[in-house]
Amino acid sequence: WPGPLTMVVKKKPGMPDATTGGLDTVGIRLPDTQIARELIEAAGCPIAAPSANISGRPSPTKAQHVIDDLSGKIDAIVKGDDCRVGIESTVLDVTGDTPVILRPGIITAEQIEAVLDKKVEIDPAVLKQSTDGSLKPKAPGMKYKHYAPKADMVVIEGQRDKVKKEIERLKGLNEQLGNKVG
C-alpha cells in the first residue's frame, strides 16, 4: 500500500455521513499513481470521491471513458496515465478479527494473507448469488450489470473471409445510422 487496495475501517466520530453513506465504516484508499498523490497533497486533506463513472457502468481505465460517461455532468477531469489494469481495487473489511474481502480485485486473498500472516475470508455474496436477496454485496461494483458494457453484441461465425465481410458490412451500416463503432 499505496495501491489498488481499499480498506474498510470504523469511521471516527465527527466524520460526515456524506462521506460514508450513513454507515459507521469508511473505505480508505491511497492511490499509487503520481498524479492522484499530488492532487491529495495539494488538497492538504483527505479527499472523498466516488468512482468516475455512472453507477452500474464499467469502471473507466482511460480519461476518454470518463468523458464518454460524464461529459456535461462534471466540471473537470484531471487526466493522468491510463490505468495499468482494468480491474477495480480489492476491497478489504478490516473492522473485525478476520479480514474479509468484500470485492475481489487485482490484489488477491493470498497476497493479503502473506502480508498479514493470517487467514482472509471472502464475503459469501461475492461467491454466490441468492435468489431470495439474502446475500447482498457490501461493496460497490459487485452487481452483475456493473461489468456489462452498454452495447449491442453480434456473434458472427463462419469462414474467415465471410466473417470479415460481414463485420465490415455491419460497421458501415452502424456508422450510417450514427452509432458508435469501435
How should these model regions be labeled?
Residues 1-182:
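Active-site-adjacent structural elements in enzyme catalytic cores
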